[in-house]
Amino acid sequence: MTAIIILNWNGADDTLACLNSLANAEGEFVVYVVDNGSADDSVLRIQSWIDGHNEVDVQLVPLDRNYGFAKGNNKGLEVAARMSPDSYLLLNNDTEVLPDFLVRLQEFSVSHPEYRVLAPKINYFYDKNKIWNCGGKLAFGFRKYYYAGSPDSAVKENGHIDISFVTGCALFFYPELLDEHGHLLTERFFFGEEDFEFSMRMKKARVPMACVLDSLIYHKVGASGNKMHHSGKVFLHYLNRFIDVRLHNSTLFYVSWTVLNAPLCFRHFYKMCRTVSGSFKLMNRLFFDARKKDAVTREDFEALVIRNDYFKKK
């Protein structure tokens, strides 16, 4: 049996669409919808859906506040662990699945037990013949998606491909990967970066991972991110990544990686502020904060992408 964890935050429309697709899914599973302190009517709407659908086992786990993506999922895993499932699946609420997506993953996990982390092929929801990714690879602190933006016909392999990066959008794994607290994801980052950090840990530990190509889901890419202030979202991404790479590698590696990343950062910052001096100020702030911080907190997140007052603080 697979325990599926779905995190909801003010996103009942997407979550209910995801549940409707899971109601037709094959295989043995139970769904835990973790409401991450929604301020709207999400809890009432999701509970109403559960009460009216007996064909699928769905349990609602309401949290008292927004704990962020990683901690919210970890809290869901704590609850699901009480059922001692054979496997877990983290699934974004802005996805919709094909009926056989889960059983394809389950069957592959039985026939290829050496792979301890699996991912389905993920296509765009609004362009269903276009691939978002088939996992990816990590190299020198960089991530590259496999088949990103390619048509379905571009995938020639049968069965699976080995990967070293897996997105948190759909992450199938075995219980032994949970830590002593029953958690999977780092809680250093309130929003974002958790899948990159997880993939770095798995690569270091030599944990085999694969994308199962005949398992398919659709993703409404960026649904939660659409609510964020754009410039803050860009800075948040780089701050998360710089801290993550620094903490996982030597000083020499981090400095070399920073030099390689600097032109890309500058280009993105220049698109945001349209001045050279403003771009350099953002670069300097990024480098300073990435050296001083070991985590990106909820306060940092809200200052960057909600209130847009992060740069008013020293």
Where are these regions (language model features)?
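Short beta-strand-to-loop acidic/aromatic patch adjacent to the donor-nucleotide binding site
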Residues: S84-E96
